[in-house]
């Protein structure tokens, strides 16, 4: 299945809330002192921020407008990259965003996705968001894709990475074929 449509943040934030919180809790637990972390825009990555310890000595970079606000409200050191703002996803995208990212070397990255498939890898409907995600994957030492069970076996218009590029953090995974191509951490396991 391939699609080019993407729902807005308000709609997506109401979907699979329990799953996003569970994934967010696991992902937040991966952040440690002295990490230099990228957090992608998106509703699952936003849920992660709620579970990051307030006293963690890490630095965060994000392309999510809401994410930057949530990070600084927790008293965490945060930067937001520059670029064009996309209203639908509240993400910073475009050439300027990619150029901003090229100066960073992240210890950990946490990236959202619309689709995860064995054949199509990690995908999203938007070319500009895919370009940002692809650059982040290149800049990260340890990459994590955050996606609930509804993202599996879905393919969108633009692939931004292959399965082996990142560890998948999900709520539950029934199809073991994905484990042959990527490390998978399950929140409900």
Where are these predicted regions, by residue range?
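Glycine- and other small-residue-rich loops at beta-strand/loop junctions that grip anionic moieties
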Residues: 16, 37, 60, 90, ...
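Electropositive phosphate-/nucleotide-binding environments in soluble metabolic enzymes
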Residues: 14-21, 25, 42, 91, ...
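Short beta-strand scaffold positions
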Residues: 39-40, 62, 170
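Conserved phosphate- and dinucleotide-binding cores of soluble alpha/beta proteins
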Residues: 66-189
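HTH-adjacent hinge/linker in prokaryotic transcriptional regulators
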Residues: 1-38, 49, 53-54, 71-76
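Short active-site oxyanion
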Residues: 33-37, 55-59, 141, 164-167
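Short glycine-enriched, charge-decorated loop/helix-capping segments at active-site entrances
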Residues: 10-14, 57, 122-126
